[in-house]
Structures are given as structure tokens and as C-alpha cells.
């Protein structure tokens, strides 16, 4: 499945909530949800009764669009989670949170996950002193994340522009030196992505 290249604000409207896909614009009055809080399309304002399948599909799409992951990679991540011990849904979200592009976003080093993914692709970040250009790279406790010296200027601009709170407790960030450490694996209560992971488990288990 090809990556979606259309207006990302339509994705937020499709699921009826902010997915924060456009960075600082999502926190401004220009946000599409603030202006047109209904589904895109001719029948967007019509009342709609969703089937059980549609409810689960919507929840899956909400998570996939939030993290900016293609379907094939999203399903592969779910397969990894289902083979692990413990709660499959919580493990699935943990694996998504550990993606390097998501970690860069959580640290406030980028204003959106899409921007973080692009910057990782372009080799602007290093893990344990080695440049990493794979957005899906999974960080582990003890990993040190740094910004490449030539990339510091625009990362600082992103920090100033972003309205993100402090990094989650499983990450330790020094926004002055643009360095961070992964302190632990993320727990379910550390993840604020607004999804019901049980519905995603049910979708892939049908």
C-alpha cells in the first residue's frame, strides 16, 4: 500500500479527532477539526451508524495514521507484539512508541512525527554515537540519542516552535544540549495516543 500523500487534515476529520499530523498548526485556530468537525465528503455531516467491523477499522486507522506507518509495517509490528509475552495491545503500542521517529517527536526535537521521520531519513540523528537513518529503528533502555552537529540549528528551531510538554518519563531529554537517553521501556500509562488497542487486537484477530 502506497503512502497517503493527500491533505492530512482529512484524516483527522475522518476519525473525528485531532491526530496532530501537522505539528503546530494542529494547536492553532486553523486546525481543520476546529473549523469543520465532520467527516470529509458530500455526506460528511450525515449521521452514520458504524458496523462492528467499521468501528475496529477506524480505531486501527487512527493508530496507523497517528504514527505514520504503512499498513504492511503496521501489521508486521502487530505480529511482533502478538508473539511477545504479556498483553498484546499494550506491547503493540510499546513497539510503536519505541520507533526512532516517534522518540524524536516525543523529545520535542520535531514538531510532528512526519517531520521527525523525514529528519531521521536524512540522517540528522545518532544513536549511541552512530548515525541512524531508519525511522522504524527500535530504541532500547540505555540508548543515547543525539543530534548530528550540522543539524542542531533547525532542531533548535523546532524546539522553539513546538508546544510539546516535557518528554515522557521513560525518556530523559536535555533540550539545551539536544541529547537524550532512553531510561526504560514505555508503559501503557505513559502513552497518550488516543486509541483503544483492544479494538485493534480484535481487528487483526478476526
From Swiss-Prot:
Keyword annotations of the record: Ribonucleoprotein, Ribosomal protein, RNA-binding, rRNA-binding
SUPFAM superfamilies, per the entry: Alpha-L RNA-binding motif
Keyword check for rRNA-binding: yes
Example GO molecular function: rRNA binding
Domain S4 RNA-binding: 98-176
Entries under CDD domains matching the protein: S4
Record bears the keyword S-adenosyl-L-methionine: no
Superkingdom of this protein's organism: Bacteria
Gene3D superfamilies: Ribosomal Protein S4 Delta 41, Chain A, domain 1 (1.10.1050.10), RNA-binding S4 domain (3.10.290.10)
GO-annotated cellular components: small ribosomal subunit
Annotated transmembrane regions: none
InterPro entries per record: Ribosomal_uS4, Ribosomal_uS4_bac-type, Ribosomal_uS4_N, S4_RNA-bd, S4_RNA-bd_sf
GO biological process: ribosomal small subunit biogenesis; translation
Subunit note: Part of the 30S ribosomal subunit. Contacts protein S5. The interaction surface between S4 and S5 is involved in control of translational fidelity.
Family, similarity comment: Belongs to the universal ribosomal protein uS4 family.
Function text: One of the primary rRNA binding proteins, it binds directly to 16S rRNA where it nucleates assembly of the body of the 30S subunit. With S5 and S12 plays an important role in translational accuracy.
Protein name: Small ribosomal subunit protein uS4
Provenance organism: Gloeobacter violaceus (strain ATCC 29082 / PCC 7421)
Gene (name only): rpsD
Amino acid at each position: 500500500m502506497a503512502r497517503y500523500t493527500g491533505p492530512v487534515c482529512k484524516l483527522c476529520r475522518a476519525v473525528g479527532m485531532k491526530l496532530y499530523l501537522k505539528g503546530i498548526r494542529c494547536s492553532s485556530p486553523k486546525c481543520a477539526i476546529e473549523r469543520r468537525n465532520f467527516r470529509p465528503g458530500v455526506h460528511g455531516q450525515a449521521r452514520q451508524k458504524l458496523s462492528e467491523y467499521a468501528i475496529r477499522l477506524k480505531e486501527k486507522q487512527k493508530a496507523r495514521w497517528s504514527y505514520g506507518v504503512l499498513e504492511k509495517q503496521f501489521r508486521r509490528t502487530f505480529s511482533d507484539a502478538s508473539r511477545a509475552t504479556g498483553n498484546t495491545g499494550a506491547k503493540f503500542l510499546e513497539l510503536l512508541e519505541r520507533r526512532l521517529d516517534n522518540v524524536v517527536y516525543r523529545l520535542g526535537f520535531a514538531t510532528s512525527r512526519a517531520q521527525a521521520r523525514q529528519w531521521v531519513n536524512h540522517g540528522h540523528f545518532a544513536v549511541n554515537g552512530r548515525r541512524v537513518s531508519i525511522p522504524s529503528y527500535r530504541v532500547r533502555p540505555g540508548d543515547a540519542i543525539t543530534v548530528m552537529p550540522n543539524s542542531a540549528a533547525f532542531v533548535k528551531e523546532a524546539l522553539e516552535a513546538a508546544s510539546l510538554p516535557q518528554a515522557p518519563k521513560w525518556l530523559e531529554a536535555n533540550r539545551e544540549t539536544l541529547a537524550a537517553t532512553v531510561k526504560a521501556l514505555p508503559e501503557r500509562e505513559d502513552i497518550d495516543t488516543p486509541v483503544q488497542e483492544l479494538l485493534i487486537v480484535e481487528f487483526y484477530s478476526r
